[in-house]
């Protein structure tokens, strides 16, 4: 029997030795490819030049074999790490509390004073096992021993967020928007505890990912450069200049393997030096701080006993070494002595190094009593708070909830095993998906496969169930195409990374070296650089197209805004979706690209287009509302007085408004509140419309109905309300905590109004009461104006008019008074005596603030908060003299600014004239003919014109009308105006042109008689009226040189009448 066992064991041993030897050989063979591993995968080059030589083919074959070996090895290492990590997190040791003594009377544990740190399953560190047993007895909890020694992750963030860890998925935690502000460990204020923990979990996931990537990279670098480690001296490696290019893990090309390793060692050496410098700096800072604290606390050293120091409550704040603020020096020293005492205990515990190993509890045994209560794969649990750590390393609310998760994990494992076995069976019995779909590959047209609706369910490669084999193959082909396109993009990016730095304005300059390469688009290129140039060009074109699309969208937006502004004046005339327009011919291009007869018809088309867009949008909104109603039908019957009461169950749901709510009930509550607000808003609008048509404002009835139940509870003008949170919005849009607080504010306002009315009646005169009521707003006046809110609180003024609120009633009165007061002051200043007085005052002000003028920086004066009240020259009290001078300087600056603005506004602006100078030469027969080009322009009169030419035509027309009005005025008035204004256009003799009639838009109406006159410009005019007309139209200043025709020596040019003469 023994001989038989030996004969069986020998072949097994030989097999194992051969496997180990082959593994070592594989590692040595694939050693050079380990540095190119990324995320457990190896990508081999697919360049065509490798296939042209025998060495290249051997290299690719070697890479392909190493790819399989290294990827398999990476998977096994990953699995081993996962298995090694699992028992650490999921194997808490047993806690036996029978070994410790209990008190005879109270039954509490009597614990020794030694320090043997133990980490509990709740994540906290306890001094020893006895202390943990005492805590269990005190709180009635069942905390076990997670591990010996201090907890590695006992930082406050994880302890605070332990309740949320079971709900984390891939580092993300879904939270509600509950408003319960919490200050996080990073010093930021978060909306609630869940939001704070979600941010912390995200940071943890990012840090873990970063650490894993750096660890993998470092291991690969270490294995790659193992042969050069002994040659490194002080972080430097000396290499030859042998040309054997190697790509490093950072994507850069190096001269050879040694050069790459030299850079890696240099970087590692610099990082280690910086770390040691940081650690030395921190240690020096700690010792320095400790030395200072020892000096400060030396006086209290003798008073401390066993690390305890008794202090008074004297308030003299000081910051301790831990960064916290302490009440006084004694309390800071007390904290320091306690910390020192704890450190001593820990050091003694480490020196003793006593450890006990406990046995892990079996979760299957712990959850055996709950297994009978499982129904349809679910276990119904209470919300009892008894934290326990589960097999997944997370802390659960109680044993029942932990067992529920344990059963779910068991079910998932069973399903996975069944799936694996089913897949094995399918792989044995059925062909692969490629073979299955090979017959459908020929039937594809333009990348699509047309299938029937035959019902023959089959599971596809994506794990989904498809109606039949054809539809499954269509999904399979689409998946293949996506994977192929993605691989091409990634390959192109990786191949062309070395050329990306050489790109300038989307172009890459290449040599004409002939080394054909196939690009990701399937075309052949002259060399690798030319292929990358085409890739970069395509990228640049895509970016350009995106920019053009964005530009088009922005241009359409600007055009739409211009059309809306242009059509705003016509919007009031729309009736039943139609706009009545004239047939005036003034062509303009609309937003739809069509040419319309005039602006009015264009606006009509624009309004119709808007109405159609609204009609299209309405069904979507209606469908959305109906969907909301259907989802919330089950909760509608639970409404009580328009309110819905919900539990705090955590089952996040996204509502129709895009917000995430705690559960479905909370979402429906928000929907009902929105419906109520819309209903109230409509009712208020109807009431306002009714009040506008009626003689008196009818807003009181609704408020009385709303607050009828609270009106009876009002006693002595006061109403007491609870703090119930049920937000309500009143008619003026103001939010209140609940309906009671809203009604309280309304009823108090009504009571104040009644008191004011009774007071005004008792006084007898409305004017006096008006003065009293508006006194509170006098202090709010700025530069003679009062700014009011739009609060709806109707008040009847002393003149009998109804105003929106008290402020608007007083605004007219106070602004009128301020204007009258300013007018009087201006009249007084015009007198010489007043001027001298004001000059003396300003001199006094300057004398007062002379010492502070030199201290101004950029027109500002920086003052301290010294309390030394001073009354300023305008009667206002200031905190000190500097603050008074600051207000004086501000006032002076404002006055200077106003004067500059008045000066600039008083000067006549000839901008419009200057802009239209280019069009003056094109005026023919007193008219300017403009093209129909659509280029909207904003004129100086605030109107929009089709283009610049139309704007200038309007400017010339207004100028002609102004000149015509000047001509119609009496001679003495016109002469005085011409003397005063240097820019006058006509300086003709008033007696010459006054007898002729002027028509607007036409000019002078001249007779047909022939009385030639010679102008000083050398031209002959039919009569003096024609000379006046030419001066008006051409804006010249021609005088009569002589009667009769001009001499033959001068170039006579008898002007034809630019307008039809009259029949007179």
Swiss-Prot record:
Residues 676-705, 751-775, 818-849, 895-915, 967-987, 1041-1064 are annotated as: Disordered. Residues 1-22 form the signal peptide. SUPFAM superfamilies: Kazal-type serine protease inhibitors. It comes from the Eukaryota. Pfam families: Kazal_1. Keywords: Cleavage on pair of basic residues, Disulfide bond, Hypotrichosis, Ichthyosis, Protease inhibitor, Repeat, Secreted, Serine protease inhibitor, Signal. GO terms for molecular function: serine-type endopeptidase inhibitor activity. Its main location: secreted. Highly expressed in the thymus and stratum corneum. Also found in the oral mucosa, parathyroid gland, Bartholin's glands, tonsils, and vaginal epithelium. Very low levels are detected in lung, kidney, and prostate. InterPro entries: Kazal-type_SerProtInhib, Kazal_dom, Kazal_dom_sf. The record marks 46-47 as: Reactive bond. One of its GO terms (biological process) is extracellular matrix organization. Residues 676-688, 895-905, 967-977 have a biased composition (Basic and acidic residues). It is found in: Secreted. Serine protease inhibitor, probably important for the anti-inflammatory and/or antimicrobial protection of mucous epithelia. Contribute to the integrity and protective barrier function of the skin by regulating the activity of defense-activating and desquamation-involved proteases. Inhibits KLK5, it's major target, in a pH-dependent manner. Inhibits KLK7, KLK14 CASP14, and trypsin. This is Serine protease inhibitor Kazal-type 5. It comes from Homo sapiens. The lineage of its organism: Eukaryota, Metazoa, Chordata, Craniata, Vertebrata.
